[in-house]
Amino acid sequence: IGKLDSVEVLGFVDNNKSVDWIAECGGHVINLLAKGSYKHCTQQLKMSPEEHLAHIKQTIDYALSKGFTVNLYLEDWSSGMRDSRDYLFMMMDELVKLPIKRFLLPDTLGILNPLQCVEYMRQMVRRYPNSHFDFHAHNDYDLAVSNSLAAVLSGAKGLHVTVNGLGERCGNAPLASVQVILKDMFGAKTNIKEDRLNDISRLVEGYSGIAVAPNTPVVGDNVFTQVAGVHADGDNKDKLYCNDLVPERFGRHREYALGKNSGKANIIQNLNELGLELTPEQTKAVTKRITEL
């Protein structure tokens, strides 16, 4: 209740069908999917750019008549910038005249690297300085996080991320990773409650049935577990092996695993958690036995 204006629903240029069903469901915001590359326009839609543009304008006019806020996806934008920039700029030159709140720029095929992302985003921002651009990364080359950061540092005002990086094919940029990098390395402020990141990750993991890798930054099971004895020893001595990603920040706590690489410091940390205290000789004996196991 009271949050409907925050719910954005994907819709299509489909003779107003999407607008109608979103309205029937009580929605107020449509993220309209248009084509950002000449190839998508002519080969998938079988339309000329002029025909596609006319259909987009008609759909937007209809959505506005229903009281909608309109955002616009330019699907395959990255390919459009690479292969058919004249088409893309022709479309944008007309679209910026319309009351579109945000333009959503996806790297649909996950083909960009950060240098390309900087180049393309800067061109968009310079050519259309009064427009709001979001960037939507895909992770096919494992560059979704890097490209998202490149985009925002080049003028993008919004980033599309997903919990646990879930998404088509290799997924999208993971929320937790993007959040901590923006905050810690660039001083960005968001409304993300970091102490809930682990909870929402587990919730989505449960509903999706897609397990989170144990070494996933921030939310993986093992990322706050120290195994090497030298690390545990350093933590005992002014937290020498800690960075800004302290587990308490995310509602978690650090653990010290026991194994063949464990040292006396690991044993002491675990004993402290259990409220136990051993003599130096006993600690040495326990450490020896643990490493043998």
Regions found by a protein language model. Give the residues of each.
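Glycine-rich beta-to-alpha transition loops that act as phosphate-gripper elements at the mouths
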Residues: 9-14, 132-145, 168
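A mid-to-C-terminal "edge-of-domain" accessory segment
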Residues: 187-293
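N-terminal capping/small domains of soluble enzymes
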Residues: 1-16, 258, 262
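Short gly/pro/ser/thr-enriched loop/turn and capping motifs at secondary-structure boundaries
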Residues: 37-40, 142, 165-170
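Small-aliphatic-rich amphipathic alpha-helix that forms the alpha element of a beta-alpha
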Residues: 136-164
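Alpha/beta enzyme core
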Residues: 15-131, 149-156
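C-terminal helical cap(s) of enzyme catalytic domains, especially alpha/beta-barrels
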Residues: 167-193, 197
